[in-house]
Amino acid sequence: EASQSPQYSFESLPQKICLICGDEASGCHYGVLTCGSCKVFFKRAMEGQHNYLCAGRNDCIVDKIRRKNCPACRLRKCCQAGMVLGGRKFKKFNKVRVMRTLDAVALPQPVGIPNESQALSQRITFSPSQDLQLIPPLINLLMSIEPDMVYAGHDNSKPDTSSSLLTSLNQLGERQLLSVVKWSKSLPGFRNLHIDDQITLIQYSWMSLMVFGLGWRSYKHVSGQMLYFAPDLILNEQRMKESSFYSLCLTMWQIPQEFVKLQVSQEEFLCMKVLLLLNTIPLEGLRSQNQFEEMRSSYIRELIKAIGLRQKGVVPSSQRFYQLTKLLDNLHDLVKQLHLYCLNTFIQSRALSVEFPEMMSEVIAAQLPKILAGMVK
């Protein structure tokens, strides 16, 4: 559920109302009209190294009386309102830039989802016909468009520091985000969606896709024994312990271990990856909601076909489908933790000496507060 606190806009309020808590404003502080209390709170939070966590659901009411109850929600609301220390402001997610990025890759016209898939029943069923050993055409296409691994640019000749590791991970995240945008352009059915929907889906799913990709690389290249962020950034347990995000590493480590346990095939992984892209949408839905539902149903059927390549029989196939979709569901809590950590690090990036590339900064500033406020489903 979205935050219960009133959503203010600068244009709609009297000039003396704090946009954070509704108290009387003392002026425009850090780019936003606020009271003295919220001004001081924001400055201390940004310059300190606090790791605020909400004890509730990240939807606490922030008003004059209760503004001190939950610093995590208060800080999130400051960020959501646009407060920036030292004039650090970011535009809304640059739709023009994304569209140019989408157009930058020379690819053939979008490949439609096969007619055979479109003609299948919307019900999820496991039939004997799925015993065919041939890889379905759409899954073959997913294999052909899978992006190459990208490098983090991390200098392994120097000792790890918290700021250097996080900066390298952010650089890697920027490159992977660009890779996701390019990959989505060649994904059958995706360009049939409204351009606003395409951008929204990428914004809401990028963290899930990156973590899922991390799990796959760790599974395939180091048998789930380490975290394989990139060929030049592989963390063994010792490096994880020495990092400032060891608990998050342990949580992320569970994904490749699940891949090992389930022995996930490449065909299954590719279908699950697309379903992650299509997993989170705004509460109000999408502009091309019907096309989105059709696309999602088609890729659910492709996952069933991928399962059928190795698993024979209705009952084992159904059990396998449950295990794989449960794995996707279990990503939700992990990704929420990563969103919180990412937003906190972003807000305090100057104090922590952590660099955030521009495109990644725009996504974080524009969408993470909405996701954490429960404005998606």
UniProtKB/Swiss-Prot annotation:
* SUPFAM superfamilies in UniProt: Glucocorticoid receptor-like (DNA-binding domain) (SSF57716), Nuclear receptor ligand-binding domain (SSF48508)
> Does the record bear Secreted in its keywords?
no
- PTM per UniProt? Palmitoylated by ZDHHC7 and ZDHHC21. Palmitoylation is required for plasma membrane targeting and for rapid intracellular signaling via ERK and AKT kinases and cAMP generation.
GO cellular component terms attached to this protein's record: nucleus
Q: Where is the protein found, in the record's own terms?
A: Nucleus
- List zinc finger spans: NR C4-type: 18-38, 54-78
Major localization class: nucleus
Residue list for modification Phosphoserine: S127
Q: CDD domains annotated for this entry?
A: NR_DBD_GR_PR
Which keywords accompany this UniProt record?
A: DNA-binding, Lipid-binding, Lipoprotein, Metal-binding, Nucleus, Palmitate, Phosphoprotein, Receptor, Steroid-binding, Transcription, Transcription regulation, Zinc, Zinc-finger
UniProt key word Lipoprotein: yes
Q: Which residues bind DNA?
A: 16-90
One matching Pfam family is Hormone_recep
**Which residue intervals define the domain NR LBD in the entry?**
130-364
Q: Which SMART domains match?
A: HOLI (SM00430), ZnF_C4 (SM00399)
> Which region ranges are annotated with the description AF2?
138-377
User: Which parts of this chain are annotated as the region Modulating, Pro-Rich?
Assistant: 1-15
| InterPro entries xref list | NHR-like_dom_sf, Nucl_hrmn_rcpt_lig-bd, Nuclear_hormone_rcpt_NR3, Nuclear_hrmn_rcpt, Znf_hrmn_rcpt, Znf_NHR/GATA
Instruction: List GO molecular-function terms, semicolon-separated.
Output: DNA-binding transcription factor activity; sequence-specific DNA binding; steroid binding; zinc ion binding
Please quote what the entry notes about the protein's domains.
Composed of three domains: a modulating N-terminal domain, a DNA-binding domain and a C-terminal ligand-binding domain.
Q: What does this protein do?
A: The steroid hormones and their receptors are involved in the regulation of eukaryotic gene expression and affect cellular proliferation and differentiation in target tissues. Transcriptional activator of several progesteron-dependent promoters in a variety of cell types. Involved in activation of SRC-dependent MAPK signaling on hormone stimulation.
Q: How does it assemble?
A: Interacts with CUEDC2, SMARD1 and with UNC45A. Interacts with PRMT2. Interacts with NCOA2 and NCOA1. Interacts with KLF9. Interacts with GTF2B.
Identify its protein family: Belongs to the nuclear hormone receptor family. NR3 subfamily.
Name the UniProt record assigns to this protein: Progesterone receptor
Organism of origin:
Ovis aries
